[in-house]
Amino acid sequence: MDTSTSFPSLFLPTLCTILISYIIIKYVLIWNRSSMAAFNLPPSPPKLPIIGNIHHVFSKNVNQTLWKLSKKYGPVMLIDTGAKSFLVVSSSQMAMEVLKTHQEILSTRPSNEGTKRLSYNFSDITFSPHGDHWRDMRKVFVNEFLGPKRAGWFNQVLRMEIKDVINNLSSNPLNTSINLNEMLLSLVYRVVCKFAFGKSYREEPFNGVTLKEMLDESMVVLAGSSADMFPTFGWILDKLYGWNDRLEKCFGNLDGFFEMIINEHLQSASETSEDEKDFVHSLVELSLKDPQFTKDYIKALLLNVLLGAIDTTFTTIVWAMSEIVKNTQVMQKLQTEIRSCIGRKEEVDATDLTNMAYLKMVIKETLRLHPPAPLLFPRECPSHCKIGGYDVFPGTCVVMNGWGIARDPNVWKEIPNEFYPERFENFNIDFLGNHCEMIPFGAGRRSCPGMKSATSTIEFTLVNLLYWFDWEVPSGMNNQDLDMEEDGFLVIQKKSPLFLIPIKHI
C-alpha cells in the first residue's frame, strides 16, 4: 500500500473531528458561562481545558492539598476533574449542612464501574443508592453482625486473639524490636475473619492470592478509572493500561473467595450449634428462608465487612501507639490510669475500661489527627440545592475533608496540629456523628454502622499493650524522632512501619 496517499485519507477525518469538537466545546463553554451567570457558584481554583483542576489535586496526599486550597478558596470549594465536579467541604459548619440539613437529598453515593462490579451491582450498604434496598441491607447488617446477640461472641474472639498477641510479645527476645504494623494487622485480620467467617483465612491463599492482596487490589480499583473522569476518551486509557482486566481479575478472586466461604458454611450448617454460628451462617439461613436475599447480597455484605473493618481499625491502632510512644508524657499518664484501674490481674476484662477517661481522650485525639479515611466517601447531589449559600447542581459529588475539618484552627484553638489529648477535658465533642467538628466515621444516615465495635477493638488492644508492657524505640532513636509521614488515598496509613521494643511490666 502507498502510505503517502493513505495517511492523509486517515488523518483528514480525525482532524475534522478534532476541529468540530473544539468548536462545539468552545460554544458550549460560552453558553455555560452566560447561563451560569445568574447562579452563585462556589469559588474554584483556575481550571485548564479538558482536565479542569486535576493539576491542583494530583498529589501524594490529596487531603492535605485540598486543605491548603481551602485556606485560599474557602470552606466550600468546587474542584473539576474532567467531566466530574466535586464540592469539597472543609469546615464543621458546612459539614453540618451536608450531613444534617441536606441529608435527605445528599444520602446517595456516586457510582463508577469499580464500585458497581465489586458491590455486585450496588447490592451492599456502602455503595448502594439510598432507598428501600439500602435500608433493608443495613438492617440485616446491623442485626446479624453488630446486634446484641453477636456482642458476646465478638468479645470472646477479641479476648482470645489479644491473649495470643500478649503471649507472643512476652516470648520476644530481650531488647529486640518488633514490627507493630505486621503484628496489629494480623491481629485485626484474625479478629474480623473469625468473628464473621468462623476462622481466619489470612494465611490461606485463594488461587495463589492472599486475602490481603485481594483487599489491597480492591482499594485500587475502587478509587476509579480514567473513564470515570473522562467518559469520552478515558476508556482508551483504561484499555491501554489494562484497568478493565485488572477489575475483572480482582472481582474474580474476591467472588471465588466468597463462594468458597459460603459453600463451607452450607456444608457445615447442620453440624453447627446455634452458639457456634457466625455472620455467614446467619446470612445463609436468611437466604434459604427468603429467595430474594440472593447469594450476591451475601457476598456484597462480606465485602463491606472486610473493607470497612480491617484497614481502618488496624491503621488507627498503629497511629495511636505511634503518638503515645512519641509523646512520652502521654504514655506515662495513660499507663498510670490503665494500671491503677486494673490493678494486678491475670487477664484484662472489658469492664476494666469503664472508668478510663484519659484513654478515651487519647483515642479521640488519635481519630482527630489521623482519621483513617481522611476524605469521607462522596455523596452525589441528585437535584439542585444550596450549600453555604452556593448553588450546587445535580451530578455534583460532595466530599468532606474530615482530615482538614478536624484541624480547623477556628474550632481547635489549642495547637490544632499537635497531639494533645487534654484538649478534650473541657471540650465535649464525640466522634460518633453527633458533632461535625470531627467525623472520622461520618455522620447522618450514611455513617459507619460499625463505629462502636471498631472503637471497642481499638480500646481493648491499646489497654492490653500498655498494661502488660512498657515500650521503647529501637536503640539509637529518640521517641520524638518517630516518622509520622502519611501515605495512602482511601485509607491513610503511617508511611514507615512502627518498630518498637516491648518490655514486660508484670
Swiss-Prot record:
Regions that span the bilayer: 10-30, 301-321
A GO term, aspect molecular function: iron ion binding
Bilayer disposition of the protein: Multi-pass membrane protein
Gene3D superfamilies reported in the protein's UniProt record: Cytochrome P450 (1.10.630.10)
Keywords: Glycoprotein, Heme, Iron, Membrane, Metal-binding, Monooxygenase, Oxidoreductase, Transmembrane, Transmembrane helix
One GO term (biological process): sesquiterpene biosynthetic process
Annotated disulfide bonds: none
Chemical reaction(s) catalysed: (+)-costunolide + reduced [NADPH--hemoprotein reductase] + O2 = parthenolide + oxidized [NADPH--hemoprotein reductase] + H2O + H(+)
PROSITE patterns according to UniProt: CYTOCHROME_P450
Positions contributing to heme binding: C448
Residues that carry a glycan: N32, N63, N121, N168, N175
Domain of life: Eukaryota
Its job: Involved in the biosynthesis of germacrene-derived sesquiterpene lactones. Component of the parthenolide biosynthetic pathway; parthenolide and conjugates are promising anti-cancer drugs highly active against colon cancer cells. Catalyzes the conversion of costunolide to parthenolide.
Family, similarity comment: Belongs to the cytochrome P450 family.
Protein name: Parthenolide synthase
Origin species: Tanacetum parthenium (Feverfew)
This protein's encoding gene: CYP71CA1
